Design a protein with these regions (language model features):
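Terminal-region recognition feature
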Residues: 1-167, 173, 178-180, 184-204, ...
Length: 274
């Protein structure tokens, strides 16, 4: 049935249609490919991380503005990153989750603006920021506009350091600029046999140095957990990674002006003060 947007009922119906389109922006084939690897979608990760029913999405109708290389013919809602606010154990947090099923999770101009906005919101409201990272770096089709947004994100990571907790979860292959930002945050969580962090991939390493190296050797979860020290926790799977972050936040203050949470001890202790 055609929607008449000149009526109140029509406007509400049109809003519902667009929300549904934003929630289901990713191609079905890309989602099937993601699930075949045992991975959640970007939105499923956010909903699994946050308290049930607490997520409020921001800028779900955002779309890229690029007209280069035929990009104007493919303008999905969200532009490849889910952003918003929610709660973990009742405490507010800000979160973004990069969507590898849309443009390979690459960061474009609008995509980067959404991430900058959610970082600004986290700092302004004094709540932790959690980034779920998976993607191939800069969106080449958007050129320097994409690269400029990386600079904006790095600047915000630096300014937020020591002000709010910043936690990064690497949920798949993350390359280029999409690993610089996590390296500037306080904690990095990676998933065994699933996550990789590297500046550039094995093919480029082979071309430049002549060395054959696998994804896992170059930037796998075990490499960064046991060799480089970039990763602070090696998760068994995505559920484990998300649950670890939920637990981690119970030890951290909301921001630099608050004390860490204090809990009653439910168990009797044999310790005595002398």
């Amino acid at each position: 049935m055609e929607i008449d947007i000149h009526t109140t009922a029509g406007k509400i119906a049109d809003l519902g249609r667009r929300i549904d389109e934003a929630v289901n922006a990713a191609p079905a084939a890309a989602i099937d490919k993601q699930r075949a690897k045992g991975k959640m979608t970007a939105r499923e990760r956010v909903l699994r991380l946050l308290d049930e029913g607490s997520f409020t999405e921001v800028d779900e109708f955002a779309r890229h503005r690029s007209t280069n290389f035929g990009m104007e013919r493919n303008r999905p809602y969200t532009d490849g990153v889910v952003t918003g606010m929610g709660t973990i154990h009742g405490r507010p947090v800000c979160v973004f989750s990069q969507d590898v099923t849309i443009f390979g999770g690459s960061l474009g101009e609008v995509n980067g603006e959404k991430i900058c906005k959610i970082i600004d919101l986290a700092v302004k409201t004094g709540c932790p920021l959690i980034g779920i990272n998976e993607g191939g770096g800069a969106r080449i089709q958007e050129g320097v506009a994409s690269l400029a947004r990386f600079g904006d994100i790095f600047k915000r990571n630096t300014r937020a350091s020591g002000v709010i907790p910043q936690i990064s979860i690497i949920m798949g292959a993350a390359a280029g600029g999409q690993v610089y930002s996590p390296a500037l945050t306080d904690f990095i969580v990676m998933v065994d046999q699933s996550s990789q962090m590297f500046i550039t991939g094995p093919a480029v390493v082979k071309a430049v140095t002549g060395e054959d190296v696998s994804l896992e050797e170059l930037g796998g979860a075990r490499t960064h957990s046991q060799v480089s020290g970039n990763s602070h926790y090696l998760a068994a799977n995505e559920d484990d990674a998300l649950e670890y972050v939920r637990d981690l936040l119970t030890y951290l203050p909301q921001n630099n002006l608050e004390d860490p949470p204090v809990y009653d001890d439910d168990e009797e202790s044999d310790l005595t003060i002398t």
